[in-house]
């Protein structure tokens, strides 16, 4: 079946085990704030989706289906252990395969993105798409608007999915203290690299740590004969981003 059947763009659907090129917007010369502001002025719904992607690293489908009131829940409703509490409120995201993850609303950017989205929708149970259209049409409209502003591989070398890459790369940098391999960062201690990659995978909604390689690039740590893969996982097909 085609990517469109699953509500995914080609870039989201294709398998990439290890990123060899930085697909983030900033790495390709895109002024992120300027583009998002322009899109918000043109179409507040698509602009709100972009703000959600930038704040939480969502897939475009997740951003369109996000319900800015119903999807915000107190920590007590997440089922996470008390020691994992990072915020009073969390965004409940239903990802691919029905997997649910909870993203802490622990920064001004995340809180502002949700507040903006709440100001756009017309009801407490609304999502970020046009309620008169089905998901496929809403996703096509999202793509149309981004194409209008030059967010294509042909024009700027990036896609909407590249904004998700931007967020996940930045998340790794914040935890590891350096850029990931795909952005030419320095080598870091194996355990620190593993912890940062695990956190990236969790934020992205992937079950396996190996999936982080699709955004960050290959692990660059010293390996010894007979050791397991540097990410500590057995060989397996990469997950779709």
Regions found by a protein language model. Give the residues of each.
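Flexible interdomain linker/hinge and immediately adjacent N-terminus
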Residues: 1-35, 94-96
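Basic, Lys/Arg- and aromatic-enriched nucleic-acid-binding interface segment
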Residues: 29-60, 201, 212
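Short, cationic motifs built from Arg/Lys/His that form the positively charged side of catalytic pockets
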Residues: 45-46, 58-59, 101, 117, ...
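Alpha-helix N-cap/helix-start motif at helix boundaries, enriched for small hydrophobics
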Residues: 61-66, 218
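Conserved tyrosine-mediated DNA breakage-rejoining catalytic core shared by Y-recombinases
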Residues: 65-113
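Active-site/catalytic core of tyrosine-dependent DNA strand-transfer enzymes
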Residues: 106-177
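Short basic/aromatic active-site micro-motif
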Residues: 154-213, 228
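Catalytic-site neighborhood detector that most strongly recognizes the C-terminal catalytic loop/helix
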Residues: 202, 208-216, 220-241
């Amino acid at each position: 079946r085609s990517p469109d059947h699953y509500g995914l763009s080609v870039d989201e659907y294709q398998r990439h085990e290890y990123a060899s090129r930085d697909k983030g917007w900033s790495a390709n010369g895109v002024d992120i704030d300027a583009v998002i502001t322009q899109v918000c002025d043109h179409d507040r719904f698509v602009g709100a989706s972009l703000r959600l992607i930038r704040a939480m690293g969502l897939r475009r489908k997740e951003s369109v289906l996000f319900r800015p009131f119903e999807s915000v829940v107190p920590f007590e409703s997440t089922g996470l252990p008390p020691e994992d509490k990072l915020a009073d409120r969390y965004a409940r995201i239903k990802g691919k395969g029905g997997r649910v993850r909870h993203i802490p609303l622990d920064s001004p950017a995340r809180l502002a993105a949700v507040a903006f989205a709440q100001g756009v929708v017309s009801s407490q149970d609304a999502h970020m798409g046009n309620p008169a259209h089905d998901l496929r049409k809403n996703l096509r409209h999202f793509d149309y608007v981004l194409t209008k502003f030059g967010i294509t591989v042909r024009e700027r070398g990036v896609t909407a999915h590249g904004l998700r890459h931007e967020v996940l790369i930045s998340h790794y940098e914040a935890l590891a203290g350096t850029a990931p391999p795909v952005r030419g960062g320095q080598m870091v201690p194996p355990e620190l690299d593993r912890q940062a990659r695990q956190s990236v995978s969790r934020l992205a909604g992937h079950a396996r740590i190996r999936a982080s390689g699709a955004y960050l690039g290959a692990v660059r740590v010293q390996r010894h004969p007979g050791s397991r893969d540097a990410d500590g996982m057995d060989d397996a097909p990469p997950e779709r981003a």
